[in-house]
């Protein structure tokens, strides 16, 4: 019988942990405050991003933190990148801002590399600056370091459910900069044997069928895409596999969500499985809060975060 890897307990415990640290930060005269930059004016992306941001804001406000939203998508396209770079520079130096989140995906005419090179690594709550990315290769501490939210959230779920990745054959489907790519590096650091599959990979079913752990982060469900769609079903996996579903897309017309993983068929064979709703999403939100606490200590000390209490 499948064990559901739910994110609610991790989310609740992380918020409780964060509230304790908010009180500790008061000794430094610091209140965690997240600045959120929205640059993408695509109607579908904008609607989705606003929903994501509202959930993140609710979490942060619930621990006693603050959130400020900057709607840069209202700037003309030709001025948006410059406006973002200037704002990031100002926020980097603002003592009352302890974390900065540039919501992805960015519009195609904004240079992502320039944006994240300008962002201070001390306030980078998504772990996307070059300096913070280096930590994935040189070694990381799951409790002390600023790490990409979804990959770190997944690893925290594994820890909570006592899923050991050492020596396991792990397939990561998708090589995106937010999930697939950083997660594959982090898993290798934890001594997993990792295979990354992408749009040009041949015979993806073969690799998935032989994997102990499958993490699917594609977001191209066949219900919405005819070009290179992806759906993980039960006939793809071996008996007893661990399956984590990350990818999903909303139908712009019906507003219905479609996901990478077919829950019903996969649940019949998997030993552990994340639900499409209430799984990785909650873990991602929890990690964002944790990262904000870490960056808040960094801002408070301007040196490095103290050793934080493990959950």
From Swiss-Prot:
Keywords: Amino-acid biosynthesis, Histidine biosynthesis, Hydrolase, Methionine biosynthesis, Multifunctional enzyme, NADP, One-carbon metabolism, Oxidoreductase, Purine biosynthesis. Its EC number is 1.5.1.5, 3.5.4.9. Signal peptide: none annotated. Pathway: One-carbon metabolism; tetrahydrofolate interconversion. InterPro entries: Aminoacid_DH-like_N_sf (IPR046346), NAD(P)-bd_dom_sf (IPR036291), THF_DH/CycHdrlase (IPR000672), THF_DH/CycHdrlase_cat_dom (IPR020630), THF_DH/CycHdrlase_NAD-bd_dom (IPR020631). GO terms for cellular component: cytosol. One of its GO terms (molecular function) is methenyltetrahydrofolate cyclohydrolase activity. One of its GO terms (biological process) is purine nucleotide biosynthetic process. Pfam families: THF_DHG_CYH, THF_DHG_CYH_C. It catalyses: (6R)-5,10-methylene-5,6,7,8-tetrahydrofolate + NADP(+) = (6R)-5,10-methenyltetrahydrofolate + NADPH; (6R)-5,10-methenyltetrahydrofolate + H2O = (6R)-10-formyltetrahydrofolate + H(+). NADP(+) binds at residues 174-176. The keyword Hydrolase applies. CDD domains: NAD_bind_m-THF_DH_Cyclohyd. Homodimer. HAMAP family: THF_DHG_CYH. Catalyzes the oxidation of 5,10-methylenetetrahydrofolate to 5,10-methenyltetrahydrofolate and then the hydrolysis of 5,10-methenyltetrahydrofolate to 10-formyltetrahydrofolate. Belongs to the tetrahydrofolate dehydrogenase/cyclohydrolase family. This is Bifunctional protein FolD. It comes from Pyrobaculum islandicum (strain DSM 4184 / JCM 9189 / GEO3).
